[in-house]
Amino acid sequence: MYTKEKINELMEKAQVMKKEMEKIQKDIKMTKIKGESGAGLVTIFMNGNYNCRKTKINDEIWNEKNKILIQDLITSAINNAVNKITELQKKKIILKTPFHNE
């Protein structure tokens, strides 16, 4: 049976965890992520909110003949950046939860 003290303790822990999660979310939003494809031929820069901030396309592939390739590389670079943000979120959140066993 839960006592008033136990309930208060749980509420305090929940508040601490909420503040930690807010800090993690803020940190992730401020993080800059670089996604690449084609061995660096296309680079996408995003922030932790999944907003694309910049796109770089290497001069080697920048011509009319490579249009389809460039489109594929841009898509791949965006997906690479999104995957990095997702992994960063998982790592930061898991490290701050009581489920982490380290």
UniProtKB/Swiss-Prot annotation:
| Name assigned to this protein | Nucleoid-associated protein BCc_301
> What SUPFAM superfamilies does UniProt report for this protein, alphabetically?
YbaB-like
The entry assigns this protein to a family as follows: Belongs to the YbaB/EbfC family.
Keyword DNA-binding attached: yes
Q: Does the keyword Cytoplasm apply?
A: yes
Going by the UniProt record, its keywords in alphabetical order are: Cytoplasm, DNA-binding
Write down any Gene Ontology CC term.
cytosol
Q: Where in the cell is it found?
A: Cytoplasm, Nucleoid
* Recorded GO MF terms: DNA binding
Q: What is its main location?
A: cytoplasm
Question: What PANTHER family does this protein map onto?
Answer: NUCLEOID-ASSOCIATED PROTEIN YBAB (PTHR33449:SF1)
| InterPro entries linked | YbaB-like_sf, YbaB/EbfC
